[in-house]
Amino acid sequence: AIKLFTAAADGARKDNRPDLMWPAQRGMARSRWGQAAQEKDQKKAAQGRETAIAAYRDALKTIEAIRSGSLGADESRSTFLATTKDVYDEAASALAERALVTAAGASGPLTGAALTDAAEAFQIVEQSRARSLLDMLGESGANITEGVPAELLKRKQDNLDRQQEIAEILTGASLNPDADKKSNSDLEAELNQLSTDYDSIENQIRAASPRYASLTLPQPLSLAEVQQQVLDDKTALLEYSLGNQSSYLWAVTQGGVSLFKLPGRSAVDQQAIDLRNQLVPTRLRTRIAGIDVAASQTRGLGVAAAAPDNSAAAAFATASNALYKTVVEPAASLLGDKRLLVVADGALNYVPFESLVTASGGADYSAMPYLVTTNEIVYAPSASVVSVIRKQTVKPTGKNILLVADPVFNSNDPRAKGAAAAPAADADTRGLGLASALTDVAGTPANQTPASGLLLARLTGTRTEAEEIAKLTRASGGQADIWLDLQASEANVQTKDLKNYRVVHVATHGLLNAERPQFTGLVLSLVGNKTGDGFLRTDEIFNLKLGAPLVMLSACETGLGREKRGEGVIGLTRAFMYAGAPTVGVTMWSVADRSTAELMTDLYKRMLTGQGMSAVAAKRAAQQGMIAGKKYSAPFYWAPFVLVGEWR
């Protein structure tokens, strides 16, 4: 087999066919690694592992060359990386295994050859992670369309306009049980083709752009660079790579690196799913694309009836501690009370580490030893992304905060006619699924908006939340702009100047579409719109120009999305990062309206008053307050809120 792969690689090189060369190089690496595993002579086995790793390096070098400059016009970088992700995983696994063998029996951080292998494996993992986001962040500061033929730019705009038109139709149709399924299927097919065409046009623009030719895109960081550029003496990185046979955890501080072997992907994913199913009541669970965690997709339920109580606490504690023991406990002695920067993988992307219980037992939510009680926790798509957004962040002056809340969802809401009276039905959770309509607490459908077919109830808690935060802002000497009712509109968000706000806070219903992440978004006023349909979708957020160091999305499931191999979770977080927000606050599931208002008010009080906490520290303190307060001590209420990106 090795001779065949060698001949195939030589032939591909001679014919200048890198697309055929990397599979041959990978085949050579796999064959040599398999041979080494069967070799009884330790010296020959070590030589076999080295030749296998060298072949993996060759394969990755070929893949990176294809990705950086010679992709076909009909192939997007993210799609290409997804198809080659296994090569990165196998190469990283080989190096990690060799590092662990070399370090066997040693205590403390890795040194010597073991550290060298672990560092190379880490960089390969970073190479395979969130690369499209890194590229987009690199391109965002450069006008790569300058000098590009006008016809090409027009094709791009026409394509985007049609995608937007179809998105508006499908968003409304997916919420309407009477929609024409055949018509929707045709539109879905057209949208798929438009998306493929758009990737082709983007690649043609890059090829035709003089600016792009001279643009140096951000490169994934080495382990030493992460220690120097990303971490501080109070922060530890936990980076996970889940593999078919084994998974790996890099625990990194400024002073050292440790590597741990974990169970394979399926085992870790199952533990994460088990915990998530304990965290989220059955009727509020969502099926996340690619990860089967759900039974149903009901929204707007009465939280008093659906939320967990202490009768479920023991089962939660068991599931939570089991996952903690698998993915955090191996590194616990290195962490102390450091801030944790978590770069997750697989189903770990859908579990808040704050909710992990560090010791088994217990049947009282308010008395459990949660990880959040000892550590601040922040998340990132990759360690390299943190470095890039940190370099690009421009801090606005002043203390301005923008608050967007309590939109008008229904045409017969009195506010739509200028009245101030509240509608009859309020929702208790902030979010909606694409498969079902919202009902009020009593189970009676809320008023319907004919244009969209959407049944959606008002969230009065978001108004209270925004007004309280505005008071806190003004009391601390800052300025708060607050958009309520019809002012909480898509047009205002898209057309007003948002660059001078230090915080942008949006409290409304979230719209999750895990199958098509570009349709995931925020629901703003659905009536009185002269432009737009009231849904601020992911693809529209990419076009915003933000200067706010913090964007807080106080809505349902804003941290969810589709996990694409090599990219992580694709959804609202990366859209807001691209738009200029280095830190994004999102939620992991459908959040309760009243408890969310309380948590957010407490969070801002700690940020804006004399305590002057960072957003990460304030969130942790607010969560601890909820745990101690007993009324909302179940993690269902406080754990879904996470911060992604910069923590400083």
Which residues are covered by each model-predicted region?
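Short coil/turn linkers that connect adjacent helices within long alpha-helical scaffolds
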Residues: 11-19, 65-66, 78
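Loop/turn elements at helix/coil->beta-strand transitions in domains of secreted/extracellular proteins
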Residues: 336-339, 398-399, 476-478, 499-503, ...
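Cysteine-dependent hydrolase recognition
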Residues: 383, 389-510, 556, 581
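Amphipathic alpha-helical protein-protein interaction segments
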Residues: 6, 33, 37-374, 379, ...
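Functional beta-strand-loop-alpha-helix junction segments that form "active/interaction loops"
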Residues: 214-225, 305-326, 449-519, 524-544, ...
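Catalytic cores of nucleophile-dependent amide-cleaving enzymes
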Residues: 502-602, 606
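An often Trp-containing, charged/polar helix-loop segment at the C-terminal end
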Residues: 391-395, 400, 595-648
